[in-house]
Amino acid sequence: ILAKKMMGAGGGSIINISSIAGLQAAPMQAIYSVTKAGLIMLTKAMARECGRKGVRVNCICPGVIKTQLSEALWKDADREKAFAAQKALGRIGDVEELVGAAIYFASDASSFTTGAVLTVDGGMVI
């Protein structure tokens, strides 16, 4: 519905938030991973369908970010250390670190970007 309104209004930017789980399989997360992979493919399909009407559709795929949802992974110092060790940057991300990606996709700086999937994961999926 939103995409149709944006196409009728001359364009815009849709930013989907998926997860690195949609790019890389993880134990005991089949359903979560399938839904996130589906959102990535929806992003690409919508980018193709909406692009000529001026609507850009892109996707941000965060890794483990310190939120209430992921609290069990970082609240305990030993678990946080184990998850941080899996990343090239050696730490878990903060919510504020997603802002730059969102601003880029929402702004004219990404006027020639559509169907893109940007990982913001500290180098976990390399």
Regions found by a protein language model. Give the residues of each.
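Catalytic Tyr-x(3-8)-Lys segment
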Residues: 77-97
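Active-site helix of classical SDR
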Residues: 35, 43
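Residue(s) in the substrate-gating loop at a strand-loop-helix junction
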Residues: 19
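C-terminal substrate-recognition "lid" of short-chain dehydrogenase/reductases
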Residues: 11, 53, 91-120, 125
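Active-site "substrate specificity/gating" loop of NAD(P)-dependent dehydrogenases
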Residues: 25-29, 34, 51-52
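Short, flexible catalytic-loop segment of classical short-chain dehydrogenase/reductase
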Residues: 40, 61-72
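Alpha-helical segment proximal to the catalytic Tyr-Lys
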Residues: 4, 48-52, 111
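Hydrophobic structural elements of the Rossmann-like NAD(P)H-binding subdomain
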Residues: 15, 57-60, 70, 115, ...
